Amino acid sequence: MSRFDQAKMLLKVKKLQKELQKQVIEVEKGEGAVRVEITGEQKIKKIHINPEYIDLDDIGQLERWLEDAVKEAIQASQKLAAEKMQPMMGALGDLGL
């Protein structure tokens, strides 16, 4: 791969990274009790807890909803990133990355 092609590919990768920064995935658990927002870069943007659905006598349930929502959000974000990167994977190997 020529240096020009390498430079073009690196620009595409940087553009993709910026796109992933802007994309937000939302996951809800507990019928809306907990909502997690995460970017395509696997960065938690926001965690929202709806107090109307929370039983203070069962904090364990809230913890499970939070844990499940965060895990699912991370998995969805990883899947999104992998799908976006797939077309570039062969060319990235040529760059030695």
What are these regions (language model features)?
Residues 1-26, 76-97:
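Long amphipathic alpha-helical segments used for membrane anchoring, targeting, substrate engagement
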Residues 13, 42, 66:
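Residue-level signature of catalytic and energy-coupling elements of molecular machines
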Residues 5, 58-62:
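Conserved acidic
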Residues 47-59:
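A short interface-forming secondary-structure element
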Residues 65, 69-80:
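Stable alpha-helical structural segments in soluble proteins, enriched in small hydrophobic residues
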Residues 26-48:
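N-terminal intrinsically disordered, cationic/polar leader segments
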